[in-house]
From Swiss-Prot:
Name of the featured protein: UPF0597 protein BT_2080
Residue ranges of coiled coil: none
Domain of life: Bacteria
GO molecular function: L-cysteine desulfhydrase activity
Pfam families the record matches: SDH_alpha
GO biological process entries: L-cysteine catabolic process to pyruvate
Family, similarity comment: Belongs to the UPF0597 family.
HAMAP family for the chain: UPF0597
Phylogenetic classification of the source organism: Bacteria, Pseudomonadati, Bacteroidota, Bacteroidia, Bacteroidales
Length: 429
C-alpha cells in the first residue's frame, strides 16, 4: 500500500472514530442548536427544529447525558443554554444540575418547536432556526453528525452547502474493500495506528462504570450475576457479552460517560471495540496484536458504512459486530480467507435486523450482534462459511457486503417508514 493512500485511510479513521457523550442523534441536534445560538450571539427566545425521520426516530426514546431525562426537548434546550459547538459530539459536557433546571423552564415556556422536515432525501438532516427579537440565525447539519452544510444570519450566509459537498466528494474518492482493510490493519507501521487504543480505554471505562450502577435494563451487570454464570459460565464469551452490553446500557440511559464512536454511532464504536479488547486481554495477546485487531474491526465498520450510510432501517449493531468478528477471527489466528468467512457468516445471520430508534433495549441487540460475532469467528476458524448458493451470500465477500447495504439502504426504506409510524402513534405503555 502506497504511503499517500495509507495516510488517507488514517485521516478517514481519525474523522470517523471520535469521542461522544450520549446518543449521537440527539447530541447532533444539540450541536446544531449550539452553533445556531452562537451564530445568533445571544440567548434564543425561540428555537425551531426540523429533522429527518431517522434523526427523529433515534432521538425519541434515549436518555440525555446528565439530565435523567429522555428525548429531544431537553437536548435542544441545553444545546442553546450551555452547548459549545467546539466540543463536537461532547457538546453537552458542561451540563450541570442548574443548567438542567434552566432547560426545564425553557421547555415549560414553550420556546421550542420540533417537527419533521418534509420532502427531503437525506436520512441525516437537522435544521435549527434560533430567533431573538428581530434577529435570526440558522444552522443545518446533513450527511454526517458533525457536518454543517449551512450557517447563516439575517445579514449573510457564513457557510454554504457547496463547500461541504466538495469535502464529501474527497472522502468518497477513497475506495475500500475487505482485502485493503485487512492489509492496512496488518501492515501499517504500529506508531501510525496506535491511536486506536483510545477506543479500548474509553469504551472499557464506560462498561466498568456501568457495572457500578443501574443503567437502562442493566443487561451487562445482570450477565455478571451468579445465576447467569450457572447458565452461561464464567467464560471469555460471557465477559465479552457483559462488557459490551454494559457500555451500551450506560450510554442509552444517558450516563455522563464518553465513549469512542464509529461512523457517528457510540453503540457501533462499543460493539467494534469491546469484544476485541476482552478477547485479546483474556487470551494474553500482545499490545501490537490488540492494536491491529482493533484497527481491522473499526476500519471494517467504516468500509461497510460507506455504502450503507450513517442512518438506515438496518440496525448498526449488525455492521459493528461484523467488524469485531473480523478482529476476533484474526486474534484466533485466522488469515484473510477466514476473516472473509466471518463476514459472510455475519451477513447470512443478521441481515434484516431493524433499527427502531436509540433506546435502552439497544443493549439487547448489541448482545445479539456480539454473540453472533463470536459464533461467526468460531465457524470461520473451522473453515466453515455460508456458501453462495444460500440466500444473499455471494462468492465475493465485497459483493455480499454490497448486498447487505443495498437491503439496508434501499429495500428497507418502507420498513423505516412503518417503524416511525408505529413509534409516533402508539399509546403509553
Amino acid at each position: 500500500m502506497i504511503e499517500s493512500e495509507r495516510k488517507q485511510i488514517i485521516d478517514l479513521i481519525k474523522k470517523e472514530v471520535i469521542p461522544a457523550i450520549g446518543c449521537t442523534e440527539p447530541i447532533a441536534v444539540a450541536l446544531c442548536v449550539a452553533k445556531a445560538a452562537e451564530t445568533l450571539g445571544m440567548k434564543p427566545e425561540k428555537i425551531e427544529v426540523l429533522l429527518s425521520a431517522n434523526i427523529l426516530k433515534n432521538a425519541m426514546g434515549v436518555g440525555i447525558p446528565g439530565t435523567d431525562m429522555v428525548g429531544l426537548p431537553i437536548a435542544v434546550a441545553l444545546g442553546a443554554l450551555i452547548g459549545r459547538s467546539e466540543y463536537q459530539l461532547e457538546v453537552l459536557r458542561d451540563c450541570t444540575p442548574e443548567a438542567v433546571e434552566q432547560g426545564k423552564l425553557f421547555i415549560a415556556e414553550k420556546r421550542i418547536c420540533i417537527s419533521l422536515k418534509e420532502d427531503i432525501t437525506e436520512k441525516l438532516y437537522i435544521e435549527v432556526i434560533c430567533t431573538a427579537g428581530s434577529q435570526k440565525a440558522t444552522a443545518v447539519i446533513a450527511g454526517g453528525h458533525t457536518t454543517f452544510v449551512y450557517i447563516a444570519t439575517d445579514e449573510k450566509v457564513l457557510l454554504d452547502k457547496q463547500q461541504t459537498a466538495n469535502e464529501e466528494e474527497e472522502d468518497a474518492s477513497l475506495e475500500l474493500n475487505l482485502r485493503k482493510v485487512y492489509d492496512f490493519a496488518l501492515t501499517s507501521p504500529l506508531d501510525e495506528i496506535r491511536f486506536i487504543l483510545d477506543t479500548a480505554r474509553l469504551n472499557k471505562a464506560a462498561a466498568e462504570q456501568a457495572f457500578k450502577g443501574n443503567y437502562g435494563h442493566s443487561l451487562g451487570k445482570m450477565l455478571r450475576g451468579t445465576y447467569e454464570h450457572k447458565v452461561m459460565g464464567d467464560s471469555v464469551f460471557s465477559h465479552i457479552l457483559s462488557y459490551t452490553s454494559a457500555a451500551c446500557d450506560a450510554r442509552m440511559a444517558g450516563a455522563m460517560i464518553p465513549v469512542m464512536s464509529n461512523s457517528g454511532s457510540g453503540n457501533q464504536g462499543i460493539s467494534a471495540t469491546l469484544p476485541v479488547v476482552v478477547f485479546a486481554e483474556e487470551n494474553g495477546k500482545t499490545e501490537e496484536e490488540l492494536i491491529r485487531a482493533l484497527m481491522l474491526s473499526h476500519l471494517t465498520v467504516i468500509y461497510i458504512k460507506q455504502s450503507l450510510g450513517r442512518l438506515s432501517a438496518l440496525c448498526g449493531c449488525v455492521v459493528a459486530a461484523t467488524g469485531s468478528s473480523c478482529g476476533i477471527t484474526w486474534l484466533m489466528g485466522g488469515n484473510y480467507n477466514q476473516v472473509a468467512f466471518a463476514v459472510q457468516n455475519m451477513i447470512a445471520n443478521l441481515t434484516g435486523m431493524i433499527c427502531d430508534g436509540a433506546k435502552p433495549s439497544c443493549a439487547l441487540k448489541v448482545t445479539t450482534g456480539v454473540s453472533t460475532a463470536v459464533l461467526s469467528a468460531m465457524m470461520a476458524m473451522e473453515d466453515r462459511c455460508v456458501t453462495s448458493v444460500e440466500g444473499i451470500i455471494d462468492e465475493d465477500v465485497d459483493q455480499s457486503i454490497r448486498n447487505l447495504t443495498r437491503i439496508g439502504s434501499q429495500a428497507m426504506n418502507e420498513t423505516d417508514k412503518m417503524v416511525l409510524d408505529i413509534m409516533t402513534h402508539k399509546g403509553g405503555c
